[in-house]
C-alpha cells in the first residue's frame, strides 16, 4: 500500500520506486501523438470485439475447465502466431521489468479486455511514455478490472458466480505477487502504447482473434491486483455489495418466513388457549381432591357402626358395648388425672422399712464399736482440758510425763466406781493392757532414776494429779 502513496495530485511519480529500472532509463522512447479519428476507430473496433468476446465467453463458460486448459496449451505451443507479431514490444517491456517471456505471456492472459475504453474515459487523447503508462496503470487498475467484471456480469449469470470466487481469492494472490503484477502491467501498457503510436500498425483480425482467446481464458482466471483499501465508490465494492445484497435478501426472506411462523398471532392465540385450558383442568382436579377430602371423615364415621354391627365370636354385642364403655370411662379418668397439677411435695416419701434382725456376731461388733467410741470421747475431753507445761527443760518434761503415766496406770488398775466395763473385759484384752502399763512404769522408773542423778527429787512433795 505504501508504494501508491508516492503519487501526487498532479500525476507526478517518485522514481525511487523504480530503482531497478535506473540502468535502462536511457532507453525511453518519445511518445507520438495520434489523431482523435484513429483513436475513435480503435475504440469502436474494441467495443465490437468486446461484444463478440462476451457472446463467446458465454459459450466458453459452459464448456469445461478442460477446454480452457487445452486452448491455453495450444496458445503456448504457437509462439509465432500473428498475435505475437502484432504485440512485438512486449518482450522488451517484460525484459525491462525483470521477467521472462513465459511469465509475461502468463500474465498477459489474465489482463481484461476493456482497458482501451477505460483509458479513453480517464485520459482524453493523452498517451504517456512507458514509465508513466505503467504508473498510471497501477493507479487506475481497480476501475479497469471493475469495468471488465461489470461486462462479465451482463454477459452471463454463471460467470458472475465464478468471478465472485475469483475476486475473493484475488486479495490473497495480490499480497504474494504485488510487484510481479505491477511489472507485467507496465509491459502490457508499453506494448499497447506502441500499438497506438504507430499509424501504420492497426489492429488486424488476427490480433483481435487472439485478444478474444485471451478474453475467453481471462474471464474465469482473472486476477484482481487492486489494493486492499479502496474508496467507497469502487465499482468492485458496489458489485460485491450487489452480490451480497441478493444473498441477504434471500436469507432475509427465509428468516421472515420463520419469524412469521414463530410470531404468528394465531399461534400465540392457540398457546394462550392451551394455557387457559390447562389452568381450568388443574382447577377442576384440585376441586375434586378437596371434595374427596371432605368425604373421607363422613365415610370413616359411617364405617364405625358397621364394625359394631359385626358379630364378635368371643363376646356378644352387649358385652362388647359394655367393654367399650368401660374403656372410655377409664380413658377419661386417666386423662383427668394427667391434667391435674402435681402435688407440692415433689420429693417421694421414704418407705418405712421393717426392722431387720441381726446375728449375734453382728450385735457383738456393734457393742464393741460403741465402747471404743465412748473411750475415745473421754480421752478427747481429757486432752482438751490439759494445760501446757510451765517449763521446757528436759527434767520438767520428764516429770510431766511421769505424772501422765502414773495417771494412766492408776486408771487402768483401779476402775472407776459405777462402771464395770474393765472387769468385764476378756483376759486377753486385760492382759494386753496390763503389759502395756507395766512397760510404761518400767520406763518411768528408769527415767526417774536418771533424773535423780541430775538433781535431788522431792519425793515427799510429789503427789498424783488426781489426789
Swiss-Prot record:
Keyword Acetylation on entry: no
Keywords: Coiled coil
Compositionally biased region (Acidic residues): 124-135
Name of the protein this chain belongs to: Cilia- and flagella-associated protein 97
Region span, Disordered: 1-20, 76-235, 336-370, 412-467
Coiled-coil segments on the chain, per record: 310-387
Organism in which the protein naturally occurs: Xenopus tropicalis
Residue ranges with Polar residues bias: 162-177, 223-235
Low complexity bias (residue ranges): 180-194, 421-439
Keyword Plastid: no
Biased composition annotated in UniProt, kind: Basic and acidic residues: 198-216
Family: Belongs to the CFAP97 family.
